[in-house]
């Protein structure tokens, strides 16, 4: 939290967690230190207003989001720091969250951090992510990969 406090003075920050209770803990810390923030989870109804407020209000430094609710369909190009507080088994979901900052209009270099506790299940989740990434890469991009061997008829059969 110390790093987030320090960066909030000069940067706009996205913080993602899959756990709403974790977001509540962070929210309490931000309020204690008088850091203005926005919040979005699956129950948020005024998503566009919250996004616009974060994008347009220079004093609103942090946007707290649930990983699932904030992972798609939102452009947050004012942010230049992204924190993933807890790992998700699917690396694509995390990448989508980070990609909220990589949109047309982004003028700053973006830094993304994954918060991982040593010797915990989080390290095992990272290993699982690496395996998933490797499997996807092998299937899609290698010459011997599954997709490269499919004929046109195979593809038609898959989708019919």
Give the residues covered by each predicted segment:
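ASCE P-loop NTPase motor core, strongest for the SF2 helicase catalytic module
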Residues: 1-160
